[in-house]
From Swiss-Prot:
Swiss-Prot/TrEMBL keywords: Membrane, Transmembrane, Transmembrane helix
Protein name: Cell number regulator 6
Pfam family, one: PLAC8
Alphabetical list of InterPro entries matching this protein: PLAC_motif_containing
Spans through the membrane: 107-127, 136-156
UniProt feature, compositional bias: Basic and acidic residues: 16-29
Listed Polar residues bias regions: 1-10
Gene Ontology CC entries for this record: membrane
Membrane topology: Multi-pass membrane protein
Species of the source: Zea mays (Maize)
Family per record: Belongs to the cornifelin family.
Chain segments carrying region Disordered: 1-33
Summary of the tissues where the protein is detected: Expressed in roots, leaves, stalks, apical meristems, immature ears, endosperm, pericarp and tassel spikelets.
Length: 239
């Protein structure tokens, strides 16, 4: 029975002889597991999420900042925090850009390198006097620590600009923090809080209730009279 089925339906597989079969040692490991070439997945990718972008995609143009670099008086609370506790304000800005970093970490780094460096320079000048050699060492230390601070804080300003597609205002982020660190810190906080307020604003839909309907006595009498007349028109036909 099986032989009849085999003869009626021949096998679709080709049997190789020993000469035609390739030896196992000629097959290199991983040769059969090569990646598949998919042209659709080789286009431009988003720098934030890594998703493949369509060919017709054009990145949005950079927008200007909503407040200027010297607009500290627009938000007095932010201005006071940035003046007396700039490390706290900087930590909150970093946490908004990088959610995986708690605000306490950049706050401590800012307090050590910026506030700590300034305090150390003042104490050195008080206890050791201000001679030419000491002044040179103090100035060199302040310039080096300030340069590190401007580079570190400028990186997060760049991240904020990429997140909200903002222009360089008034110049490169690192240079802004190097020259106007306190003003830049307050500007970033104002921009961040303003963007969050715009995103959280939900449009409200006003629904007006239907008008109150009242029935007067005259309409009620007319309605009862109409119902009675309908019943009076009924005719009884004997069978």
């Amino acid at each position: 029975m099986a032989e009849d089925a085999t003869s009626s339906h021949p096998s679709r597989y080709v049997k190789l002889t020993k000469d035609q079969d390739a030896p196992a040692e000629d097959i290199r490991p991983g040769e059969l597991n090569q990646p598949v070439h998919v042209p659709q997945l080789e286009g431009r990718r988003c720098s934030e999420c890594g998703q493949v972008l369509p060919e017709s995609y054009e990145p949005p143009a950079d927008e200007p900042w909503t407040t200027g670099i010297f607009g500290c008086t627009d938000d007095p609370e932010t201005c006071r925090t940035g003046l007396f506790c700039p490390c706290v304000l900087f930590g909150r800005n970093v946490e908004a850009v990088r959610e995986d970093i708690p605000w306490t970490t950049p706050c401590v780094c800012h307090a050590v390198f910026v506030e700590g460096g300034i305090t150390l320079a003042i104490l050195t000048a008080i206890f050791h006097g201000v001679d030419p050699r000491t002044s040179f060492l103090i100035g060199e230390g302040l310039v080096f620590s300030w340069w590190l601070c401007a580079t570190y804080t400028g990186i997060f300003r760049q991240g904020l600009q990429r997140k909200y597609h903002l222009k360089n205002s008034p110049c490169d982020p690192c240079m802004v923090h190097c020259c106007l660190h306190w003003c830049a810190n307050c500007q970033e906080h104002r921009e961040r809080t303003g963007r969050l307020a715009e995103n959280n604003a939900v449009p409200m839909t006003v629904v007006n209730p239907p008008p109150v309907q009242e029935m007067s006595m005259l309409e009620e009498v007319e309605e009862k009279g109409a119902e009675k007349s309908e019943h009076d028109d009924v005719e009884v036909i004997p069978l």
